[in-house]
Amino acid sequence: MGNRREFLTATAAGLAAAAAPARAAEERTAAPKSTPAGAPPFGMPRDMVLLNMRRGHGYALGVKTKDGVLDVEAAGRALGMPVPADMDELLQNGRGPALRALIDAVEAAPDGRFVLPEAGVAYAPVVTRPEKIIMMGFNYRHHAEETGTPIPKDPPLFNKYNNALNHHGGTIALPTQAAREFDYETELVMVFGRECRNVSEADALDYLAGYCTGNDFSARDLQTLTSQFMIGKTSDGFAPLGPYLVTADRVKDPNNLKLKTLVNGRVRQDWSTDDMIFNCRQLISFASKVMTLKPGDIFYTGTPQGVIFGEKIPRKDRAWLKPGDEVVSELEGLGELRFRLV
């Protein structure tokens, strides 16, 4: 992993000698090849595993290290360095160079004061204020086949709202007065780090800040009431996301990742993102021709086969999810997302 990934802490006394110049920090931020003339610099740092933490009535940014979680706010305050307060500020205001400068400083003079034990972290959704939560339906060939759905010719996009956002270690209060057919959908989630409009497939991935694990939790009976999915998709807490945002440079091929779902310890989905009908590049390019994608927007890319909705028995006989169940979603290299139903 190397020293660069060992984001240790520093003392204020070591700051003057340790802090990297802003110019050097900017050189280590990712910049899309297709950056238009005059556009602001792309502000996401490279080679990081980031997380959002709940703190009081707000959120705080953390960086996962081999020793725990670097508390960005605490380190910045102690060292007198301006830093992004949370993930949303990092993404939406392009504060990557500031975060990189802080990490350079704390790596050079470690003392452990700003590293939190991860076991005690109160996770927040990776992103808490996206302008858009874009969802993709029936994007895995075998999932479409198991549900008897024709292979789509164009991406069938829909949406969730911010009330659906949830976090690693969270709970979902099932809306049992409105529905009973609750189902899991583990998905690869793309998170945007730069404004994106009318981009080519070749350049599409350059606009991503990173990737994370998500679950498109669903109420199938509400979903199938009409031709519109939304009512069965965006109840409170129906979009768990996390625990980490892994920066895009760490993911060599988002369409070659193992994906798994477990319910109460039993494997229910075990597949790969290489079964997508529309790959990540195609999804971004398609959506960018319809709307402007903004930093902090999140894009769920669909789920593979193995959902309850695809079982070949009558719906009334299926073992739909219920209060007390624990769901675990895993994406290779992106972390394990856990949540419980109540």
Regions found by a protein language model. Name each.
Residues G56, V63-G68, F192-R194, N264-G265, ...:
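Short acidic-glycine loop/turn motifs at beta-strand connectors
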Residues S34, G38-P41, H143, A173, ...:
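Catalytic-pocket segment enriched in acidic/His residues
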Residues G38-P41, V49-L51, Y123-P125, E145-G148, ...:
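A generic local secondary-structure boundary/capping motif
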Residues P150-H168, Y184, P323-E332:
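Structural signature of FAD isoalloxazine-binding scaffolds in flavoprotein oxidoreductases
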Residues R4, T11, A25-P155, E326:
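N-terminal non-catalytic cap/leader segment that marks the start of a structured domain
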Residues P125-V126, K132, R180-F182, S285, ...:
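Residue "hotspots" at secondary-structure boundaries inside conserved domains
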Residues F138, K160-N162, G169, T176, ...:
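Short, structured patches in soluble enzyme cores that scaffold and shape functional sites
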